[in-house]
Amino acid sequence: LIGPAFRYAEKNDFILKNPMRVVDKPSKVKKESSYYNAEQLNKLAKAAKGSYIETPVILAIVLGLRRSEIVGITWNNVDFANRLLHIKQSVIVGDSSILPQGTYRVIGHTKSHKSKDIILKYFLKTDSSERSFTINDALYNYLKALKAEQEVMIRETNAYKDFVCVNAVGTLILPDSITHYFTNLLDENGLPHIKFHALRHSCISLLANNTAFTMKQIQDYAGHSDFLTTFNVYSHADNSAKKTEMDYITSCFDDLFDDDNN
C-alpha cells in the first residue's frame, strides 16, 4: 500500500519525488520444497489403499508425475505387450477457447454452477515432459488388475472409459478432486501436510539420494526440460545399490502394491 500511496502523491504534486524509487526491492527468499522421505511415503501408500485417490497417489509416488499428467493417462498409453507407459497428454479444467485449435479436445464439463471445460491437452508442460517408462512387475500387475476391474464396473458414463484414473462409477477423477481428497487423506491419517505435487519431489528425491543414478537419468525420469533444474533442486545424493529407477522406488515400500493387485 505504501508504494501506490507515494506514486499517487507524486502524480498529484503533493510531494516532489517518490522516495520509493530509490528503495531496493527485497530479494525473494526461495522456499524449500517440502517432501516426504521413504518412511512417510510408505505410511501414505498404506493409507491410500482403497481410497478415492489410490491410483493417483501410487502413480505420483512411483513415477513422480504431475496431477494433470496422471489424469491424462489413457489405457491407450499403457502398452502391456512391451511393458511401456507413455506420458504424452494431460487433463486440465478451464476455458478451452484460449487454447490453440488442434491442440486439445473437450471431453466433458464440470457440474458446478459455473461449468468449466474438462480439457484433454495433446501437449505437456515442456517437450521433455513427454516421456515413456518401462513398467516393472509391480506396476504392471497393478495396472493389469485395475484395467480388469474397470472392464466389469457399472459406469455412470462412458465418456471416460479410456482413462486410467476414474472413480467407482467411471467418472474421471479431476486434478482439483485429487488435491481435495489428498488433504483429507493426510488429515484422517495424521500425516504431515504437503501438497500433492510434493509427491513428485519426493519420488525424485529418492532417486537423487541413490548414487547409482546420474543426474541425467533423474532428469529424464522426471521429464525436466534442462539438467540445471534437476541438479539445483535434487543434487544431494548419498548411497544405495544399482537398480533401475522404478525398481528402486518400489523397493522403498513394504506393500505399495498389495496382494489384491498382483
Identify what each model region corresponds to.
Residues 66, 74-76, 81, 214, ...:
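Short coil/turn motifs that cap or connect alpha-helices
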Residues 11, 58, 62, 69, ...:
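C-terminal catalytic core of tyrosine-transesterase DNA break-rejoin enzymes
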Residues 82, 91-127, 137-139, 168-169, ...:
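C-terminal secondary-structure termini that scaffold catalytic or DNA-interacting sites
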Residues 1-22, 66:
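N-terminal DNA-binding recognition helix of tyrosine site-specific recombinases/integrases
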Residues 9-19, 93-99, 145-157, 261-262:
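Proline-centered turn/helix-capping motifs that create local helix->coil transitions or kinks
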Residues 27, 35, 91, 140, ...:
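Catalytic-site neighborhood detector that most strongly recognizes the C-terminal catalytic loop/helix
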Residues 22, 26-53, 62-65, 138:
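Long, amphipathic, Lys/Arg-enriched alpha-helical "connector/arm" segment
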Residues 115-119, 126-191:
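Active-site/catalytic core of tyrosine-dependent DNA strand-transfer enzymes
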